[in-house]
Amino acid sequence: CAPTWRAEQEDYDLNFQQLVKSCKRKFGGEWVVLFRNHKYHKINTLKNQIDGEYVIDVSEYDDMQELICISNILITDYSSCMWDMLLTKKPCFIYAQDIERYTRRNGFYVPPSAWPFLIAKNNEELENNIMHFRDDIYQEKIKMHCKYLGCFENGNANKAIYDFVKEKLINKGIN
């Protein structure tokens, strides 16, 4: 879980216990929530849910990319980490209890209704989105969204850079 920063410093009311139960029922296996708060946002009401067993506070962990790599799903609101998760093609759910107000105040380049993610405004909607999640539909939405935005990610960035530099060096007579 990774909420974004808000000037209002409102508390995030995500029910971690219910989240873990929903993930177990839908996806099977054992689940642990890694909660990463925004570094400028101090959420107080969640502190009593962070038990170190099912919910671990990783707010001080610097590398969000590593957390995305080890995560099976992501729950966020408007944090840009959703787009990093999209590239992994792993499930991402939006928990945005203040979506109307946030949209009015801040706006979005691409409206949330066009995102490939299921959006929930409360814990019940989030549970419903998890329980009715279909990976085949999600993968198709990702593909269409990437096509719409012009995504060039194909997993070969290092090779493309290597080939580009090599070609430039060869053209200059450097081997």
Where are these regions (language model features)?
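Conserved catalytic-core segment of nucleotide-activated headgroup transferases in glycan assembly
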Residues: 1-47, 153, 157-159
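C-terminal alpha-helical cap of glycosyltransferases
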Residues: 154-175
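Donor nucleotide-activated moiety binding/catalytic core segment of transferases
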Residues: 34, 39-83
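Catalytic binding pocket for nucleotide-activated donors in carbohydrate/polymer assembly enzymes
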Residues: 46-51, 80-150
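Residues at the C-termini of beta-strands that transition into short coil/loop
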Residues: 2-3, 37, 59, 96, ...
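A nucleotide-sugar donor-handling region in carbohydrate enzymes
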Residues: 1-11, 139-143, 170-174
